[in-house]
Amino acid sequence: IGYKNARNKLDLETLTDILQHQIRAIPFENLNIHCGETMELGLKAIFEQVVWRNRGGWCLQVNHLLYWVLTTIGYETTMLGGYVYSTAANKYSNAMIHLLLKVTTEGKNYIVDAGFGRSYQMWQPLELISGKDQLQVPCIFRLTEERGIWYLDQIRRQQYIANEEFLNSDLLEKNKYRKIYSFTLEPRTIEDFESVNTYLQTSPTSVFTSKSFCSLQTSEGVHCLVGCTLTYRKFNYKDNMDLVEFKVLNEEEVEQKL
């Protein structure tokens, strides 16, 4: 990810730098599924895919890699399991399908997640405190705790859609207030995600098998390729508004972008 730490301090600033370097260097993607390959959970396979092959992965992979990195350099890091909210179903997933991290530094707990992608991706660790609005470049994030269950939501800006033909696109997030996922603080291991890792890449009902996607954060926004449709969102480009641009690519252009 190109990160060099001259400060050599395991604090919030270093943690933030590592997270931002990772989300701008390692795409959130599921391309293996659509290339006839398997999304592996083993650390050796993930390292080979991400580091040596210069690829990305989904949450179970990129956050597993991040967990290994943070633990290795000395951060107190715990794996947690999340239940992703579906706007279509209007509920959280029944299965634990998301991997996120809790990191303790300087006496405080933070949620760290490099694997949600698109315009829902946090750019900084979120302090694990209930009911506090935490402003970041992409949006306002809010964690809320109720009876031992934590909920991550976001409050989004208004958006200007440059291509009018995409005003009603399913790829366009239309809600200002968006639920993202829920989780508990029960520690998990990577083995807890083995069955769901298989399900997500084999079930015909999984969104990951029906669509290919690849998203990468930039210093100003996020690129997202779903199928042949490329979206670029520039956060807060003017007047507290995001700019959203769409482009449909042909097969040659898709390969060039990837």
UniProtKB/Swiss-Prot annotation:
The active site is at C59, H98, D113. It catalyses: an arylamine + acetyl-CoA = an N-acetylarylamine + CoA. Its EC number is 2.3.1.5. Gene3D superfamilies: 3.30.2140.20. Substrate binds at I97, H98. InterPro entries: Arylamine_N-AcTrfase, Arylamine_NAT_domain_sf, Papain-like_cys_pep_sf. GO terms for molecular function: arylamine N-acetyltransferase activity. It is an enzyme of class 2 (transferase). The keyword Acyltransferase applies. It is found in: Cytoplasm. One of its GO terms (cellular component) is cytoplasm. CoA binds at Y199, T205. Keywords: Acyltransferase, Cytoplasm, Transferase. Belongs to the arylamine N-acetyltransferase family. Participates in the detoxification of a plethora of hydrazine and arylamine drugs. This is Arylamine N-acetyltransferase 1.
